[in-house]
Regions:
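Bacterial N-terminal signal peptides that target proteins for export
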Residues: 1-7
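Intrinsically disordered, low-complexity coil segments
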Residues: 31-32, 70, 183-184
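Gly/Pro-biased beta-strand-loop elements
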Residues: 41-155
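Bacterial N-terminal signal peptides
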Residues: 7-15
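Exported/periplasmic cell-wall-interacting domains
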Residues: 22-24, 112-224
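N-terminal targeting leaders of membrane proteins
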Residues: 34-40
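A subset of N-terminal targeting peptides
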Residues: 3, 16-18
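Cleaved targeting-peptide boundary
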Residues: 21-32
Length: 224
């Protein structure tokens, strides 16, 4: 399975542009940048949010775990930026009960999952007074840049690689490129927070987002 184009990942990580955010207008940049492909599940969730206003007037991000990618939208649903991500090393969509109270050394390999679901995310402080976007504070899942940590993990190289499987390396947190974090995520979420929709990698999409059942029925009725 392949990721999105290598060049896009390079731009997102090193900040040549704000993770595919718009560049200044010029004669050479009149053509709109091509959109990063979105998976069918990502498109379904994006369409559902747009149709129902599920974000309640707040910015939101879609984390597609199977594609190891995040898509950022403003409060009105305008696509702002997208970037590759690193996620929990263990497949799965549920956090282990009590995992948020454990130290990193106490978390077992099977517990290092990035839970799926809809989360009201807000900025706050983590260990070491690092400011992060808390996706699910109870389970200690946050969205932040790649930590210094252990260089043997090669997180930067994993984010740049053309494959998806090696993007599973974290304890459950969602690592994003610096440019995406500083120029996209933080300006949008800093004041009031926003919603983070984490798509599943083992469960059915409708099991994680039940309203999609209703959305499917409405589309079926409209086409009949």
């Amino acid at each position: 399975m392949h990721k999105f184009p290598w060049a896009l990942a390079m731009l997102a990580l090193f900040g040549a542009s704000p993770a595919r955010a718009a560049a200044p207008e010029s004669a050479a940049s009149e053509k709109p940048a091509p959109e990063t492909p979105r998976s069918p599940d990502a498109r379904r969730v994006i369409d559902w949010i747009a149709a129902t206003g599920d974000n309640h007037g707040l910015p939101y991000a879609i984390v597609d775990k199977q594609a190891a990618h995040v898509f950022l939208f403003d409060a009105r649903g305008k696509a702002l930026a997208d970037a590759p991500v690193l996620i929990g090393i263990a497949p799965g969509d549920d956090a282990t009960p009590g995992v948020g109270k454990k130290s990193l050394a106490e978390i077992g390999p099977a517990e290092k999952t990035t839970p799926a679901g809809r989360f009201l995310a807000k900025f706050g402080l983590a260990a070491g007074k690092q400011r992060v976007l808390w996706v699910d504070y109870a389970t200690s899942v946050a969205m932040h840049t790649i930590p210094k940590g252990n260089p043997k993990e090669k997180r930067r190289e994993r984010m740049l690689s053309p494959t998806i499987d090696d993007n599973r390396i974290t304890f459950g947190c969602i690592n994003v490129p610096i440019a995406f974090y500083n120029r996209g995520l933080r300006p949008q979420f800093l004041k009031k927070g926003g919603y983070v929709y984490v798509l599943p990698d083992t469960k059915l999409l409708e099991a994680v987002f039940p309203p999609l059942h209703v959305q499917s029925y409405r589309k079926a009725d409209a086409s009949s």
